[in-house]
Amino acid sequence: MAKKSMIERDRKRARLITKYAAKRKNLLVEIKTATSLEDKFNLHRKLQQLPRNSAPVRSHNRCTITGRPRGYFRDFGLSRHVLREYALQGFLPGVVKASW
């Protein structure tokens, strides 16, 4: 199980990403359409003044049960350990153990 502080930090990042998403997107569009170099620098400065954790690249996928950051399956939102456990117990409909 991941540390509670790491899980909470990722949740905080997710909240910041949603809060500043529109503002960040508008600034990026303005940067692309700006013609003068000075305008672009000013817009970049505004973009850099946004919180660092509001950038989507800083978020990390984590298992919803354990908070494990590695071995994450996007389709289920679970780590490989929990996915295997749930699949064997029949909690994931349509998921069966492979046999050939």
Swiss-Prot record:
Pfam families: Ribosomal_S14. It is found in: Plastid, Chloroplast. GO terms for molecular function: rRNA binding; structural constituent of ribosome. The keyword Ribosomal protein applies. Keywords: Chloroplast, Plastid, Ribonucleoprotein, Ribosomal protein, RNA-binding, rRNA-binding. One of its GO terms (cellular component) is small ribosomal subunit. InterPro entries: Ribosomal_uS14 (IPR001209), Ribosomal_uS14_bac/plastid (IPR023036), Ribosomal_uS14_CS (IPR018271). GO terms for biological process: translation. SUPFAM superfamilies: Glucocorticoid receptor-like (DNA-binding domain) (SSF57716). Belongs to the universal ribosomal protein uS14 family. PANTHER family: 30S RIBOSOMAL PROTEIN S14 (PTHR19836), SMALL RIBOSOMAL SUBUNIT PROTEIN US14M (PTHR19836:SF19). NCBIfam families: PRK08881.1. Binds 16S rRNA, required for the assembly of 30S particles. Part of the 30S ribosomal subunit. This is Small ribosomal subunit protein uS14c. It comes from Chlorella vulgaris.
